[in-house]
Amino acid sequence: MVDFAFELRKAQDTGKIVMGARKSIQYAKMGGAKLIIVARNARPDIKEDIEYYARLSGIPVYEFEGTSVELGTLLGRPHTVSALAVVDPGESRILALGGKE
């Protein structure tokens, strides 16, 4: 079992993540992400776009069970984060959430 909060912080510290729905959609379109994480309460149109483009690019999508406020807090940000793209997992095992590792 992967501890989401721990692995997310590890990916943030040792790898590369890109925060924000717009950037996550761009990475889904380009196929540049290894995993996309979407908050449970993200707007439906954002979820649909991310899922559509990620499916075309073969990128797994993980739905975070918390809200965008909680996701932002986990990342140490003072704002909401509705989606993020994991470009490089670094030393984390975050990709296990998407079934890849």
Swiss-Prot record:
Keywords: Ribonucleoprotein, Ribosomal protein
One Pfam family from the record: Ribosomal_L7Ae
Disulphide bonds in the chain: none
PROSITE patterns, per the entry: RIBOSOMAL_L30E_1, RIBOSOMAL_L30E_2
GO molecular function, one term: RNA binding
Domain of life: Archaea
GO biological process, one term: translation
Record's GO cellular component terms: cytosolic large ribosomal subunit
Family listed: Belongs to the eukaryotic ribosomal protein eL30 family.
Protein name: Large ribosomal subunit protein eL30
Organism from which the protein derives: Thermococcus celer
Gene: rpl30e
